[in-house]
Amino acid sequence: MNQINSEFGPDAGAKAPLVVALVGPTASGKTALALELAEHFQLEILNIDSRQLYREMDIGTAKPTAEQQQRVTHHLLDLRSPDQPITLQEFQQEATAAVSQVLKERGVAFLAGGSGLYLKALTQGLQPPAVPPQAELRRQLSSLGQANCHQLLQQADPQAAAKIAPADAVRTQRALEVLYSSGKPMSAQQSTNPPPWRVLELGLNPMELRSRIAQRTLQIYQEGLLEETRQLSQRYGPDLPMLQTIGYGEALEVLQGGLSEAQAIATTTRRTQQFAKRQRTWFRRQHSPHWLTGQDALSEAIRLIEAGLG
């Protein structure tokens, strides 16, 4: 694991370039702070949010708007259609190339997002299994239903299952795909080979996170989550794994008559709050961010980055 306390020694600048990562749970304010930091230091933003890698999933993922992307150049957004899954290994390869290019051009790279596993793969050199997507197997798993799939994973690879939420169809299917294709559980196939970067992790974890999540959920429904979900369902079918993820799953139930919009908003809020709790646990156990705890997160982050650039 990259440790912050050893990054900024007297010779650190000569040894390796600096990668700054702004992390934290959903609705913690990462997007707004990332834009301010990028503008202050004249940086570009590299996305590490797993759902924002997909095109046509804008509202439900709180993807940076067109106006925000005009303010600051973003990378690693809209890489594929939502019916073309991106494996962790594929993300790692694409993101490593993007980081290397930005470092070459600007001397510092700036990551922002809430997907801890993707951050770990990129900054700690996690080596995921090289198993390509298996379309037929995924169709079979989808037909079983997510509850059965997660139960299968608990039996076959309890270590991997413990790290995946029961409702997370995308990661559950991927873990089973790796297991059935290679004969080895995913948890036994991951090693690390850290890249030659210094990594400064900055974390956001506001006290009012629960109310921020409730406000964010209401906002995405008001902005058109139901219509976005309708279009995705019509184009790719209602069994699309990405339509089982938080927000889209509840919106799909509204469209199918299973939930009222008010019920869907309440369920999405609850699921997001549960997910945010898991995100905080992940960042606490798997990373060592400087938590921005002061009243002025921007000034605190600027000071830490300037020290890193030193």
From Swiss-Prot:
Residues the UniProt record annotates as site (Interaction with substrate tRNA): S115
UniProt keyword list: ATP-binding, Magnesium, Nucleotide-binding, Transferase, tRNA processing
Assigned EC number: 2.5.1.75
Catalytic activity: adenosine(37) in tRNA + dimethylallyl diphosphate = N(6)-dimethylallyladenosine(37) in tRNA + diphosphate
InterPro entries: Dimethylallyltransferase, IPT, P-loop_NTPase
GO biological process: tRNA modification
GO MF assignments: ATP binding; tRNA dimethylallyltransferase activity
Family assignment from sequence similarity: Belongs to the IPP transferase family.
Protein name, UniProt field: tRNA dimethylallyltransferase
Organism: Synechococcus sp. (strain CC9311)
